[in-house]
């Protein structure tokens, strides 16, 4: 992987991790364009995912600081309930990761057709959430946190946007727009770090191929993903507040159709 390829893929990861257009789907498309096999860029994938976690920590630092300050009071307050909701939202993705990891990895290697189909599904979800006008709730309940977690678990499919699925689901449930965007970005931190840790351990044990990627490419990819992630995270929060997700639905529909057509021509 050349440094300019790492730059482009890093920018794609940072932007699409937060924008509701599927980071996994766009990385798959980008890797296919550059002729990079999935097994060859595991180390790069870990690096850019960790970079987006740092982006979240930077942009949502005030919220994270608020959570930890309240959590260490060791009492049942709003901060503690927030953490409980995040833990509840992690249950579905945890079950998928533990019991269905091999099946999910097999789907990731199934080509661009599944990516295109899932992008169309993302477009449908975003459209439904845009036109539905449920009464907004003040806070995200435990029940809603679990349902949003189910949406996140389904979004392990390449092309089905994680942020798009979780935010669209929350909007359909009537959750507060501003709080929903923050919750969606915070709830993904533990799963991303957990997956990166497991993949890193596999590489150390020799159970997975790290890929012969130059250090410069890894550094460039990290910086690109971090900077673009910071911009996209802040931008996405404002987009959700203003209810402008329909534009991303149109984008996903177009890219989905093009991807399906290209997959059939290969």
Swiss-Prot record:
Annotated keywords: Antibiotic resistance, Cell inner membrane, Cell membrane, Cell shape, Cell wall biogenesis/degradation, Hydrolase, Membrane, Peptidoglycan synthesis, Transmembrane, Transmembrane helix
TM spans (from-to): 41-61, 82-102, 106-126, 140-160, 180-200, 213-233, 245-265
Protein topology in the membrane: Multi-pass membrane protein
Its EC number(s): 3.6.1.27
Record has Transmembrane helix as a keyword: yes
InterPro entries tied to this protein: UppP
Record's subcellular location: Cell inner membrane
Any single Pfam family the record assigns to this protein: BacA
Disulphide linkage map: none
Major localisation: membrane
Top-level EC class as recorded in UniProt: hydrolase
Keyword Membrane: yes
Catalytic activity line of the entry: di-trans,octa-cis-undecaprenyl diphosphate + H2O = di-trans,octa-cis-undecaprenyl phosphate + phosphate + H(+)
Any one biological process term the GO annotation gives: response to antibiotic
Superkingdom field: Bacteria
GO molecular function: undecaprenyl-diphosphatase activity
Any one Gene Ontology cellular component term annotated for this protein: plasma membrane
Cited function: Catalyzes the dephosphorylation of undecaprenyl diphosphate (UPP). Confers resistance to bacitracin.
Protein family per UniProt: Belongs to the UppP family.
Additional notes on this entry: Bacitracin is thought to be involved in the inhibition of peptidoglycan synthesis by sequestering undecaprenyl diphosphate, thereby reducing the pool of lipid carrier available.
UniProt-recorded name of the protein: Undecaprenyl-diphosphatase
Organism whose genome encodes this protein: Bacteroides fragilis (strain YCH46)
